[in-house]
Amino acid sequence: MLFLLSIACGPSVDAPSSSAIKVGDDGAEIDTSAAGISAFVASKAYKTWAAEANVHTATKTRPHGHVRVFFNQTSTVALKQNQSSLPVGTMVVKELYQNDGATLSGYAAMVKSSEKGWTWWEAFLPNLDKPAAYGIDLPGCKGCHSGPGNVDQVLSQVP
């Protein structure tokens, strides 16, 4: 399954240079380099964000299997206001689970890093410092996230 996820999102393409973007509900910044996103996810700082109530099966068109999605305040406000273009600083973190829906296997994150696009990141335990996918507007990530029902690449409903 991990191989399929790597193929779905694709390898690193057009990796962005390190830059800091405000994503924290308290104005905290995140370094959008692969190492910066890895460190942010490993810190579990996203756990204070709005989140789906439970782990659930992703739809058949999504490669992530079982997921639980967390939304930063920027994304929560924009999605609740039905904005069609989300602001820079929007961040969504997905916890990825094995088929049993209980065993955490990795994470995927997306950060609106510019008005024109998203920085995508995906890594699997125990190697969060070695992402399977990382870059700006990765074709595999964009391919799925551009599907029906998306709001500026976000497919999940804010809780």
Segments and roles (model prediction):
Residues 1-2:
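Sec-dependent signal peptide recognition
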Residues 10-30, 36-65, 77-159:
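Sequence context surrounding c-type heme c attachment/ligation sites in exported
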Residues 5-8:
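C-terminal motif of bacterial Sec signal peptides marking the signal peptidase cleavage site
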Residues 70-72, 79:
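Small cysteine-rich, disulfide-bonded extracellular modules of the LU/uPAR three-finger superfamily
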